[in-house]
Design a protein with these regions (language model features):
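Glycine-rich phosphate-binding loop of ATP-dependent small-molecule kinases
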Residues: 1-225
Length: 225
């Protein structure tokens, strides 16, 4: 047998060396960042944090000393509970309502273009709003987190604030980076009662708007869908 014949790989060896089907498919290039963001909470959070650093400056990322994260089914009382929290914790600013943030010009531009407001966009809107100096003493966030990815982002956010606290401990900026205090509030309600309250709220809104239209006095209420 010649040297060339001896060095020739067997059929079994050739099959073993064949690339996987995914590597052979020319239509499948390297994974895009957008694809990873859908699943990777760390990528989402660190991307958002980097963007905030670029926009505001790292030393200006000062968040509220205390944050209440409020969630619950429609009709569970998310609209009424904040008043009690504000009174109890001596907060003066109205809650940050995620559904309202999604009506902002930036968010509407993406939605109108057929793009969904995903975890990355929502997380950035929420964190960006919390940087407002008016929330320095504390804030209530209504409607975040709502997905598993957002829950993981919230954990990373708490970790980052703890990291900033440690970094500035013992410095003249210590008071500007307080120890993070997160309160997770979940309001529960059974389905039947939820439906009843939503119907009642809708009826009251319709009646109020009809009165405003007839009298020309007052402001119309938004009909929630």
């Amino acid at each position: 047998m010649s040297v060339d014949q001896k060095s020739k790989p067997s059929q079994k060896e050739s099959l073993r060396k064949m690339p996987e089907p995914e590597d052979q498919d020319p239509t499948k290039g390297p994974k895009k960042v957008e694809d990873l963001e859908v699943k990777d909470a760390q990528l989402i959070f660190h991307t958002v944090w980097h963007e905030l650093e670029q926009e505001f400056g790292g030393e200006n990322l000062r968040f509220p000393a205390e944050i209440f994260w409020l969630n619950g089914s429609p009709g569970a009382g998310k609209g009424t509970q904040p008043a009690f929290i504000m009174e109890f914790r001596d907060l003066t600013e109205k809650p940050i309502i995620v559904s309202e943030l999604l009506k902002s010009p930036e968010a509407r531009k993406k939605i109108d273009a057929g793009m969904l407001a995903g975890d990355r966009e929502v997380t950035k809107l929420v964190l960006g709003s919390l940087l407002d100096p008016e929330y320095e003493s504390g804030a209530i966030v209504d409607g975040y987190p709502r997905t598993k990815t957002q829950v993981e982002c919230l954990k990373l956010f708490h970790g980052k604030l703890s990291e900033l606290r440690s970094k500035h401990l013992g410095t003249f900026q210590e008071s500007q980076f307080p120890k993070p205090r997160f309160h997770i509030i979940m309001l529960f309600i059974d389905e039947e009662e939820s439906v009843r309250r939503q119907l009642l709220r809708g009826q009251r809104t319709i009646a109020h708007n009809a009165e405003v239209e007839a009298s020309g006095v007052g402001e119309s209420w938004e009909i929630r869908k």
